[in-house]
Amino acid sequence: MLPNYSDTGPGAGALFQYALSRFKRMFTMALKATIYKAQLQLTDMDRNVYADHNVIIARHPSETDERMMIRLLAFALNVPADDKQGNLEFAKDLWDVDEPALWHKDYTEQIRQWIDVGQPDDKRLMRAAGRAERVTAYSFSSSTPVWWKAIETKLTRAANLVVWQIEAAESQALAKLAERSMQLQVTVQDGSVWMSTALGSVDITPRRLTASS
């Protein structure tokens, strides 16, 4: 239910219209999204993170199985060990360009990590680098080398940015594991990821494109 802004003085009308537009956007998203659920059992020996997560993804009508599963991979690789400094959440980038695919906000709404998937342009990544403590991007298309060559030199000032490449064959194999309800096991060791469901398993080795600091 929307708050009543009708008697709050000057500017109340604009405030109400803003609240109404936000409500409509959220309502439209809820109507069009397809809900996917994953019970994710994570064993990350590289980060010493061992946890079970019940993940709910509101999938945009235009999102492919491949992209959705890359978001799940990104969640597994970045979810913090605890919630003392906030949570990593799936965001609404396909509905709202001002949001990433996932983000980790602390309890003051500070963006601790911004995660994009796909091939964002350099301007988007630089804006994200100015808003968040850390920015991570995962590209999974066969055209990744071309995309990266075009923007690499434009990102040198973004010291808090890390870009990863997922080989197209690996992301396509991962897409075949997608189901509306999944029980997903993820093991991370020495930079390699093993993801398994009832439909099969996939080995993934993300390759870092940005230079190590």
Regions from the language model: what does each represent?
Residues D46-L94:
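Acidic-basic catalytic patches of nuclease active cores, encompassing PD-(D/E)XK
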